[in-house]
C-alpha cells in the first residue's frame, strides 16, 4: 500500500507512580518499534493518575522538566514520533495545571503542544461530582501540526464532545488526522 504509515495506539492503565508509568510506556514504545510503527499514540494521563486533584497538581511540571525530557529521550532512542495525549503541565500558579497534548518527533524534539480547551465538569444529583475546571486551566489555541501521518489535529479526551473543534481543525487548520 503506497503512502502508508504504521501507528501504534496504546491502551494502558496509569497509576500514581511516574517511574512505573514511564517503564510501561518505554516497553510499549519498544514493542511498537519492533512492529514497524513510526508513531505511538498514548492516552490522556499516560504519565500519572493521582488519587486526588491535589496530588495531580503537585506533580505538574513544565515542558522542559524531567518527565518530558524522559519522553523526548525515549522518542530519540526509539526513532519514533510520540503523541502524548494528556500531560500534567504546570499551570500559571501552584493550584492549577494544563492538560497538554504533546507531540514529539523521532529525534526527540517537541514539535507541538495543545492544552485542552473543554474541561470535564460533572455534578450528578445524589452521585458523583468532578470539576476538572477547579484545578485545570483551559487552553485557548486550536493546534494542528505536521507529522509522518500528515497534518494532525491535537485534542484531549473530552474535547471529542465538541464537533466544532474538529471542524475548525479540518477546515481552518487543514488537519488530515485527529489525535
What are these regions (language model features)?
Residues 2-7:
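Extreme N-terminal starter segment of soluble prokaryotic enzymes
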Amino acid at each position: 500500500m503506497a503512502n502508508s504509515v504504521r501507528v501504534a495506539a496504546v491502551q494502558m492503565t496509569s497509576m500514581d507512580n511516574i517511574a512505573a508509568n514511564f517503564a510501561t510506556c518505554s516497553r510499549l514504545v519498544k514493542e511498537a518499534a519492533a512492529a514497524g510503527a513510526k508513531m505511538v499514540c498514548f492516552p490522556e494521563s499516560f504519565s500519572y493518575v493521582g488519587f486526588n486533584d491535589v496530588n495531580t497538581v503537585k506533580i505538574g511540571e513544565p515542558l522542559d522538566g524531567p518527565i518530558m525530557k524522559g519522553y523526548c529521550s525515549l522518542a530519540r532512542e526509539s526513532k519514533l514520533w510520540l503523541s502524548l495525549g494528556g500531560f500534567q503541565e504546570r499551570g500559571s500558579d501552584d493550584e492549577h495545571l494544563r492538560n497538554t497534548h504533546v507531540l514529539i518527533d523521532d529525534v526527540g524534539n517537541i514539535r507541538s503542544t495543545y492544552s485542552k480547551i473543554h474541561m470535564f465538569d460533572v455534578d450528578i444529583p445524589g452521585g458523583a461530582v468532578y470539576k476538572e475546571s477547579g484545578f485545570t486551566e483551559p487552553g485557548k489555541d486550536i493546534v494542528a501540526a505536521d507529522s509522518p501521518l500528515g497534518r494532525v489535529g491535537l485534542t484531549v479526551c473530552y474535547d471529542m464532545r465538541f464537533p466544532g473543534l474538529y471542524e475548525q481543525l479540518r477546515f481552518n487548520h487543514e488537519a488530515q488526522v485527529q489525535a
